[in-house]
Amino acid sequence: MGEERAVSLDRRYVRSADYLARDIQGQTVLIPLSGGIGVRDEPAYSLNPTGAAVWRALDGGASLGEVAGALAAAYGGERAAIERDVLALVTQLVAHGMVHGADA
């Protein structure tokens, strides 16, 4: 289900239309869709607030490096650490088919 190309800070990524994001009791939950809400055999995926900010930014308009830079500016964190966290999260999301490269 994963992409052949490695996840990179230079690439732009987009959310899959096969997942619906909903805020439930303070958490963002990604719900798999297929023929209706929650029909796929895959579990829902919960994101913390930072992960939710990454998810919202994955619209193909900014590279992952730009997303990480915006998060570092917004949260005052160390850019290198945020880049590692963004890469780790997006690698998981790509592996589960929740996002894909904007050029795919």
Please state what every model-predicted region is.
Residues M1-G26:
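Hydrophobic packing positions characteristic
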Residues G26-P32:
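A short glycine-rich, His/Asp/Glu-containing loop-to-beta-strand
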Residues G2-L9, G36, R40-A104:
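Long, charge-rich, low-complexity alpha-helical segments
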